[in-house]
Amino acid sequence: MKKSKLSIILLILLSSPLYGKENNQDKSQEKETSNDVITVKATSIKNKETFSSLLLNNREEIKGKQLEQIKTNTIGNTVSKVAGVQAEGFGPNAARPVIRSLSGNRVGILVNNLPINDVSFISGNMPIPVDMNRINEISISKSSEALLYGGSSSGGAIHLWDDRIMTQFPEKAISGAVTFNGSTNNGNGGSVNIKFSNKENWIFNLSGATKRVSKYKIPTRSKVGACYSYQQLKDHFALRDQCQVDMKVFTSRNPEAYPYISEFWKKYQVEYELSEDDKYTFKDKDYFSGIGYVDNEPNLRYKPGSPTSIEHVTPPKHYVENNNNEIPNSFLKSQSGNASLSYIGDDGYLGFSVTDFQTSYGVPGYAYLTTKTTRERYKPVSVSNSNRRIDIQGKHDHLAPFLRDSAFYYSYSESKDEELVGQIASSVFNTKSHQLALETAHTPLFNRLNGAFGINGNYRDLKTSGYDAYLPSVLTKEYGIYWVESLNLSPFELTAGYRKGYTQHNLNIPANYNRGRGQGSNLQNRHFDTSANTLALSFTPIDEWTLKLQQNISYRAPEINELYTHGPHYAYLIEEQGNSEFNTEKSKSIELSSVIEIGNFSNKLNLYKTDYSGFKFRRLTGISRGAGPVMEWDDTDLETKGLEYE
């Protein structure tokens, strides 16, 4: 009865195959490990992973005690301890991950198998709408995942897992937990979670969390030492600008160097608006029309040999005052809540959840300048995000004799991101997005060939506003279809996959819209055909050692910030100009990896090389305007390579 009920529910929701993972019997055969960080084997079937990702076998996991030990407020800082992974530096409250020197548009961030379709890739100071308190597992792929998710994951991906939709029964009919935490330098917070289950089919889950930080303390001052050096500030005008220090340095005539006081200055000082520097002269006479030469008055302050000018320096004053031993404007406020309902049967599950996430925080460092929001030149900057998301997920095992399992993932979210200068919104991003992913895995063919077929699509409607908006409103649609197969020829395994995709950007520009200047003023709708393919050969002579050679090729469509930015981008203190003439970016990578796991001992070695054609990057133009240096998006060929050892 349970099986037929769930089949009916799923067939109503789906008219095509769905995507999923191994069945419960296979999961029980999964090899146990005490390591908190492991490399996922193709034979280790996780309830959360898609089957195609297990076939690619590229991910490392962080979970359990290790995750609790390294977890911070941001995703980037949490995963930065992994070899080859760093974090962008926008303070303790905003840090996107950087994988092998790549970030932003090339590194995907996914929650429960769906990409986060937000605007944090546009600017590193923008928040990622995820409450790290609720994350219980992280998977990291340092290799390209463009085959599964498109070009936005061509440089790798970070997968976040939480229990917003329950897929397994809790041990008790009613269970929960309440936590409180606090520290002298990381704020205070707490969380609550409660689960209700009838022990047969249904689970209802409620959870919430909050976090507050007033400021972060540091051992020294918050700015670089040169910003407090009187001599360096006096000698370098650009340094005073970068440090946002008001320090006037100017010269005037030295009265003691001039023997005479000008009679012409005495008579015409007011009429000709003459300055104090015009008062003193080396001439003993001044000429007046109709009168002739007139003797100048001797300067009683005159001292022969004195320098002709005097340097004046005002005391340095920081535009935004900050106390020693603390990061200014480093506050954080966040809260989140989730409610979900799951139906679990013998052959799979179906779940629905609603999540609300709110956060606001200061951007430490320097305030924005020359913004249109206020006449006052410098104001502290803060960022806020409000995100509401609906998730629906389902999985069905053994949908047909020739199908292993199928599953689907869907989310709808509404998000509002604001960059605030003082209390006024400088840039506002309102986003509505739909995301859908379907995947079906077939049963093994000839007991050797495993594979999966998938479809995914993203719809993002971005509307921009604000005094300093540097992007137009854009509607983006992205679709992709992929197929991956793995042939087991023990001790060898051959894996291959191919993806075909399409991306479209449609502008929504009012008639009186300010298109900016430079190359960013040429705004036009664009569409791109994309693709990706993967070929990998694994050699596992013994269970504890795997050697793998892998090649990935992908074509990434340019993102909206690369195409359409056209004005001051205050997060980077630059003027940014996009280029809507861009074509796709090609990346071709090859990687050799070795993984040895014996008990609690793990040894990992990765050697990689990636060649880019049409790599998109910001280039300095040599021009400076009110917002700072002008940078234009450009493309070039690029090679990256490296060696990682853990």
Please give the residue ranges for each predicted region.
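Outer-membrane beta-barrel signature, preferentially recognizing the C-terminal barrel domain
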Residues: 378-399, 521-546, 550-612, 622-646
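Transmembrane beta-barrel wall of Gram-negative outer-membrane proteins
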Residues: 186-212, 222-360, 386-388, 395-397, ...
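N-terminal periplasmic accessory domains that precede
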Residues: 75-78, 95-98, 110, 125-128, ...
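Extracytoplasmic beta-strand/coil segments of soluble accessory domains associated
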Residues: 76-115, 142
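Flexible loop and strand-edge segments within Gram-negative outer membrane beta-barrel domains
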Residues: 326-334, 347-406, 412-435, 467-468, ...
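Signature of Gram-negative outer-membrane beta-barrel scaffolds
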Residues: 449-546, 550, 557-558, 568-570
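Short acidic/polar hinge/loop motifs at secondary-structure boundaries
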Residues: 115-144
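N-terminal periplasmic "start-of-domain" segments of outer-membrane beta-barrel proteins
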Residues: 37-68, 104, 138
